[in-house]
Structure formats: structure tokens, C-alpha cells
Swiss-Prot record:
Keywords of the record: Amino-acid biosynthesis, Cytoplasm, Diaminopimelate biosynthesis, Lyase, Lysine biosynthesis, Schiff base
UniProt name for this protein: 4-hydroxy-tetrahydrodipicolinate synthase
Lineage: Bacteria, Pseudomonadati, Thermodesulfobacteriota, Desulfuromonadia, Geobacterales
UniProt GO BP: diaminopimelate biosynthetic process; lysine biosynthetic process via diaminopimelate
Keyword rRNA-binding assigned: no
Pfam families documented for this protein: DHDPS (PF00701)
Gene name tied to this protein: dapA
Record family assignment: Belongs to the DapA family.
InterPro entries, per the entry: Aldolase_TIM (IPR013785), DapA (IPR005263), DapA-like (IPR002220), Schiff_base-form_aldolases_AS (IPR020625), Schiff_base-form_aldolases_CS (IPR020624)
Catalyzed reactions: L-aspartate 4-semialdehyde + pyruvate = (2S,4S)-4-hydroxy-2,3,4,5-tetrahydrodipicolinate + H2O + H(+)
Length: 290
């Protein structure tokens, strides 16, 4: 259903408010440079610090600006199952192609709780749903066995695996077969994950290098594994630089250095330290991004 390079787009701000003009420009920048789909209001889009009205408005803006050129996927996850169902219903009304559902954070549910949470959403709203496992941020790991239980639901079509573990991603693929598509949630292992059977990446790096990440996944699908491997190695340093501080602080700083949008983030995130900004700027100069 979805494949290739999917950008987890940032939400630009201007003096505390969502910057609609810059967001629309970023959507065009992505599509013009070969991005296959766009996730609005993911982790990189600072969904956790958008209020409900802003959250749905960002999804609407991205969907409207995409104009059907690429699929738009809405982040509608929450640590409240009822809230996740509400956001998913609203996103479906907007017209998005699918939703991305992060595991409930802070509550620390059991595997049974995770299974019941995702099943409740999938039962409630008929729309393609992508599970999102990122234990480094949520405090809970959606285990391969639980993914396999969920994979049989007709509305659950994929998982974004952001454990950083090639072993866990491989176990998901081994257990689920073709029942569910797997996407890398970490740019630094996109190529190895695709070699194991992943369909692509939901990418942070694509915010600043959409063509390179798109070329990587395109080369893989074209059977040019050497080109894909080389692009993987070539983008490794910049992908790692996107995490020298908490995401999306580095990628927003990078976009600001490129003149694409403000580096403004919402508290409790803070602007990048001067030392890390200098490191990031040096790496971006190596890549001729600035």
C-alpha cells in the first residue's frame, strides 16, 4: 500500500503559532524532490505539543497542499485509546490515506494492553493503520509476537519499527510474513532493513535531503543494490547528526540553516546548544546543504 521514502515532516512555527505558509512550502519541497508519501503530526511534527485543533489543522494543511500528488498519512496516536480513536476518525474525515499510531506512552501498558488498544482503534475506524514502535521515547516495546497478533486485522497494514534493532525488525518480518508491511523508523538502518524485506523508511533525514533518501529506496526497488548501499553509507553521517539532540531539534535547526523555516520548537524542547549547532553546521557544509 505504502512504500519507499516517506517523510515525517516537521511542523514549522512562527512566534508560537503554526506557520502555514512555510508548512505548505515544505510539502511542495518534498513532493518536488521525489518523496513518496508524507506523515503529518508524527514525532518529528511535534504532535505531543500541538493542541487538538492545531493537530487536525496541520493534517488538513498538509493534505490540502499535497493535492493528491502523494499519499498523506496522519499521526493520530495517543496514550488515551479514546483520544486515538477520535483523532483517527477526524483524520479519516479529512481524507488522508492512512494513519500512524504511536504506542501509548507513559502509561506503560502490558503487551495485552497494547493489543487491546490497537484492536479497539482498528475496530472503530476503517482506514489503513500503521503501528509505530519507538520504545526509546514511549517507555514500552511492542514485541514481535504482539505485532503478529495484530497483523491479522484488515485495517492494520504496516508497522514503523523504530527500535533501532535489526534483530527485532527481522523477527517481526519472520513472524508476520506478508500480513503486514514493515518500515524502518531509523534512517541509519533503512538499507539493511530493506534487505530483510522492509518496504521503505519513515524518515527524519528526508526533511533536508528528500532526493537522496528517495534515490536510496528507488535504487533498491530498481534492483541497483550497489547504488542503494552507497547512498546508505553516504547519508549515514547526516542521518546520525539528526539525533545529536532530541528530534526534531536538529532537523529544525538544519532546515533553518537552509532557509526553509524557523528552528522554533515548543517547550519542553529547547533550542539547540551552540556547540551542537556548530557541529551540525559543519556536517551540513560537508554535504553542501548550506
Amino acid at each position: 500500500m505504502f512504500k519507499g521514502s516517506i517523510v515525517a515532516i516537521v511542523t514549522p512555527f512562527n512566534n508560537g503559532a503554526v506557520d502555514e505558509k512555510k508548512l505548505r512550502e515544505l510539502v511542495d519541497f518534498q513532493i518536488e524532490n521525489g518523496t513518496d508519501a508524507i506523515v503529518a503530526c508524527g514525532t518529528t511534527g511535534e504532535s505531543s505539543t500541538l493542541d487538538n485543533e492545531e493537530h487536525l489543522n496541520v493534517i488538513k494543511i498538509v493534505f490540502d497542499q499535497a493535492k493528491g500528488r502523494v499519499p498523506v498519512i496522519a499521526g493520530t496516536g495517543s496514550n488515551s485509546t479514546a483520544e486515538a480513536i477520535h483523532l483517527t476518525r477526524e483524520a479519516k474525515e479529512i481524507g488522508v490515506a492512512g494513519v500512524l499510531l504511536v504506542t501509548p506512552y507513559y502509561n506503560k501498558p502490558t503487551q495485552e494492553g497494547l493489543y487491546l488498544h490497537y484492536t479497539a482503534i482498528a475496530d472503530a475506524v476503517e482506514i489503513p493503520q500503521i503501528l509505530y514502535n519507538v520504545p526509546g521515547r514511549t517507555g514500552v516495546n511492542l514485541l514481535p509476537e504482539t505485532v503478529a497478533r495484530l497483523a491479522g486485522h484488515k485495517n492494520i497494514v504496516a508497522i514503523k519499527e523504530a527500535t533501532g534493532s535489526l534483530q527485532q525488525a527481522s523477527e517481526v518480518m519472520a513472524l508476520c510474513g506478508d500480513q503486514i508491511d514493515v518500515f524502518s523508523g531509523d534512517d541509519f538502518i533503512t538499507f539493511p532493513m530493506m534487505a530483510c524485506g522492509a518496504k521503505g523508511v519513515i524518515s527524519v533525514t528526508a526533511n533536508i535531503m528528500p532526493k537522496a533518501i528517495g534515490d536510496l529506496t528507488d535504487a533498491f526497488y530498481a534492483g541497483d543494490l550497489e547504488k542503494a548501499r552507497q547512498l546508505h553509507l553516504d547519508t549515514l553521517k547526516i542521518s546520525n547528526a539528526m539525533f545529536i539532540e532530541s528530534n526534531p531539534v536538529p532537523v529544525k535547526t538544519a532546515l533553518a540553516l537552509m532557509g526553509k523555516c524557523s528552528d522554533e520548537v515548543r517547550l519542553p524542547l529547547a533550542p539547540m546548544s551552540a556547540a551542537n549547532k556548530a557541529k551540525l553546521e559543519a556536517i551540513m557544509k560537508e554535504y553542501k546543504l548550506i
